[in-house]
């Protein structure tokens, strides 16, 4: 274990590894081998397998709540072992470590990269001959631990132009003649259907959502509709979402990731169900 100057920095973990296998625990073990005093926080490990867009969304919505200098480790890596770069990025709020596949593009759209490097210095890897299928263990976890322990980002490898980093081509909402068209970009544990339409589009407006031929009223709280009814509202992360009061919108409405929807703007006296 190398000597470091920082003992109590924070590392977050995000992956599509789930909780059935040992992969997450193995990465935590590698981090502890580098520096057992580091704090490790699980963001989530239930990202749908190989779904970089969902990983991007989750990290983008989580990172603002962590202290300055936090190292965010993201491993949703369908291209593991290929020519895709392994990277570390410094931005205003901390650091990002993982594959260069667009997983960090949501964060970097809000906070541009200050410094980015390709992880070419194997001194900071677990082994100089990493597995072709588990860079999370052999490259990303140890690099994140060293970075959180005070190693400068420049020591980790060759500096690269931040403009060269992969930007994920995610679906954007767009204005229509009657409102805003978008899609479902995330489904949470409660079955709430989170769209890619930000709160700013519906502020100070009367609105509803149309999806799969169903009109759903836009409200402020779950209790604004009867128990068991569908509702559209702005969720805690600032996106228009669809829920069922006391129920599971995903299961009850049979709506899935990337299904299309439209926010419709209503006249002051117009009913959403009219």
Task: Specify the residue positions occupied by each region the protein language model found.
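N-terminal glycine-/serine-/threonine-rich phosphate-binding loop
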Residues: 1-83
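Active-site histidine-anchored catalytic micro-motif
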Residues: 34-37, 54, 67-69, 74-75, ...
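Conserved active-site and cofactor/substrate-binding residues in soluble primary-metabolism enzymes
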Residues: 22, 26, 35, 50, ...
